[in-house]
Amino acid sequence: MIQAEEFVIVEKKHLDNFTILYVEGLIKLGESAEFFSSALENVLKNESTNVIIDFTKIDYIDSTGIGELVGYLGKFTTQNRKLIIVNPSERIQKLLKLAKLDAVFKIYNNEEEAIAAESGSPAPR
């Protein structure tokens, strides 16, 4: 477990061509947003996989966190890679929709659905 302020990367795992980051807490201005950014930068520079961020345990994200997501979406896209969000809470879904980012990000209910849709193989049962 890697931790900063109120933000924690609980686990990182690899599955097929995806790195999955399991995160929890708050992504907001300050140390937590910087830590979130460094985790994404680490995957961007040190791995050649697509990234899935599991938002199941993210309670809050502010404009700084949203800005980091949008910035890294551009960086991953430039490298022909994907940045995918899974399991966002209803509150986060509303926020993404309000900012019209639900049309920009690939958002799925769970990692299995995301991997199946983005790799072209059927979801595991």
Regions found by a protein language model. Name each.
Residues 13, 86, 108:
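General small-molecule cofactor/ligand-binding pocket signal
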Residues 28-105:
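Amphipathic alpha-helical interaction surfaces in cytosolic regulatory modules
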Residues 4-38:
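STAS-typified acidic loop motif
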Residues 106-110, 114:
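Short acidic-hydrophobic, aromatic-tinged amphipathic segments that line or gate anion-handling sites
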Residues 119-125:
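Short acidic DE-rich linear segments
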Residues 25, 89, 111:
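Short, flexible active-site-adjacent loop segments at beta-strand->alpha-helix junctions, enriched
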